[in-house]
């Protein structure tokens, strides 16, 4: 299609633009998005624009090293590094934590059901995921003075079990003036990425 203009971007950046123009980000200025699914992705609106950085690799939040500080086995990420956020806070990471705590094989959907039923290993797996998210968010705040965070994707539906440790850990690792940070969980917003892809032409 030599006569047609097109744009190409990753799903996390598209979801971030979807939130900026059509979702929770409409009411915010500068904010970060964590996409929580099979992996962990992210995007950042700063100065009113989606930031891309050198080579388009700005805000690869899924690969912030947080796992080496946790009281459980360090895991190798698909990127090749150890202890990435993705190894703890993605559906894959939560499943690995559950197996480590319980010794049982379960799917991510089954673990969510176990958490709803009060299963201790499932609740702990989500708590660890929330703790890791809190560490990552605190790092971003201390580096960039950003305090508005949107969490989207399938894992974000587990807000009930993620939020307590996320907030506790965030406050433990940030200055008091940042303790009014917003943590917004969007659920069922499956069109954010599609709408954001369309919004690439608005940037």
Task: Name every feature range the model reports, one short phrase each.
Residues 1-14:
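N-terminal glycine/serine-rich phosphate-binding loop of ATP-dependent small-molecule kinases
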Residues 1-3, 18-29, 68-203:
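ATP-binding/phosphotransfer module of carbohydrate and carboxylate kinases, centering on a glycine-rich
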Residues 10-12, 20, 61, 87:
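Generic detector of well-ordered alpha-helical packing
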Residues 11, 37, 197:
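Active-site glycine-centered loops adjacent to acidic/histidine catalytic or metal-binding residues
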Residues 13, 49, 156:
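Short, glycine/serine-rich, charged loops/turns that create anion-binding
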Residues 26-88:
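Glycine-rich phosphate-binding loop of actin/hexokinase-like ATP-binding domains
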